[in-house]
Amino acid sequence: MKKVVDINWLEQHLDDPELVILDASQSTSVNKQENAIQGKYIPGSHPFSLQEFSDQKSELPNTLPTPEYFERKCRDLGINSTSKIVVYDNAGVYWSPRVWWLFHVMGHEEVAVLNGGLSAWIKANQATTESLSQANQPGNFKANFNKELVKSIQDINQNLTSQSFHVVDARSKGRFDGTAPEPREGLKSGHIPNSLNIPYEDVLNEGYFKSPDKLKELFKHTSSEETLTFSCGSGLTACIVSLAHSLISDKISPVYDGSWTEWAQSGSPINTKES
């Protein structure tokens, strides 16, 4: 299954009994901006709340749940081990790559993001519905945790010395340089030492992933042999850039799950443009 599919692909596969469509839309973005499309869904979509599919006991936002919890929630949605999953959101491409990454972490590779999201579907005059679907019966989804796709703060700290992988930060240049504030109150801006900045907005064009040639240009300072790890503010937009990289490298790189929210409040080293 392709990592990213377009509306034509989805339209042609709507009758596939193995297809599961997940709506990962949110009413507001991380910076509190209201998303334009509300109350419209692709027919047959099931609700996928990133808040529900996160560690409910963590003080950090969006962190990974346990495999057992993830498995149970997926079964509640009627997802099977053989399901072909397409996920979309109402912000073009924003929330959905996190869901794509979550399924890969949990061992399910038959998952794709809808390029352009719900807005692309609506612009193509495709039918929408005002309600989400519920599962007719529980699924048999089985989680198989892939630890290779997740980095912890301990891994990142050890890498400051070992330099075994390169951290790519998906936050804005201002936040990375330490010249713009973080959206989360009390967090200092800046970046993990020796990291590279590729803002998530740079891999997108009006809610669609840029062409492979343009993505390759963005990653020109990394080599195909180099191991990358993606980070951002809370592990969300890092998944957008991770997915973009996978489109040109044919491999899926890990994400630092705690990301800057964890790093900046941990006492770990912080670099800025001036340091």
List each language-model region with its residue ranges.
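Cytosolic catalytic domains that perform sulfur/thiol-centered chemistry
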Residues: 1-275
